[in-house]
Structures are given as C-alpha cells and as structure tokens.
Amino acid sequence: MHHTELLKTLIDEGRLTIESGTYKGKRITFHDPCYLGRANKVYNAPRELLPSLEADLVEMKKCKARAMCCGAGGAQLFKESEKGDKEINVLRTEQALEVRPDIIATACPFCNTMMTDGVKTKEKETQIKVYDIAELLYENTK
C-alpha cells in the first residue's frame, strides 16, 4: 500500500482530519511517479486527496498512464547529464508549468528532487513550490 492510499483510507475512515484553508483555490498539478503509476496502477488515490485541501487539480496533458518520467526512474538523478537539447526533468517541469500551477505535487522523494531541480532551472522557485502530497496534508491536519 502506497502512502497516498493509506492517507486516503485514513481520511475516508475519519481517522485523519484535514482543515481546509491553506491551499484553498490553489492550482495543484500532480506528477505521476513511474513506479506508482505505470508499475502499480495507482493514479486516483493521490488526486482524491486534493479535495480535502479545497485545492484545484490542474492536469498536465501527459498524465496518469501517459505521464512522462521525470528522469529519476531512469537513474538520471544519480549520474552526469548526457548530451542532448534538454534535461528530462526540465522537460517534465515545462509540461507542468504549461498548466500554470501554484504547486507541483508528487508522491515520490526522487520525483520531488527532480521536479524541484527543474523548477530551479526554470527560475520559478519563488512562484512555484514542489511538495510531496503528504506534506500538503500534514500542514493541514487538525
């Protein structure tokens, strides 16, 4: 069971109470981690957590089963860049930026690092934050 599924269960059972307010009306896009989504077919649980924050989900064109890897699953996090036009995490970050989010959420620590680096590369770190979805919920627990 992934932590987003556990959090969804706890909220549904009333064992975890979330206060709204902090993220009310914020535009949040969710980056699907490769192993969570494509390998384990978990797409809905993370998205079903956002209504408890009263946030607005804005989907990237490539999401769920069609989502692009941020590069961490391909070990880009641990090696030097290869020749090419663009880093894969920057390309994925650009896809996220197209939907004008306030926040990019994910559910993988490696994706979090890659997307954070992409936001920094695009010099948007003062406008857009990257969080694990559990962090967003934690900030709003009663």
Across the structure, where does each feature detected by a protein language model lie?
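Iron-sulfur cluster-binding electron-transfer modules in prokaryotic oxidoreductases
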Residues: 1-142
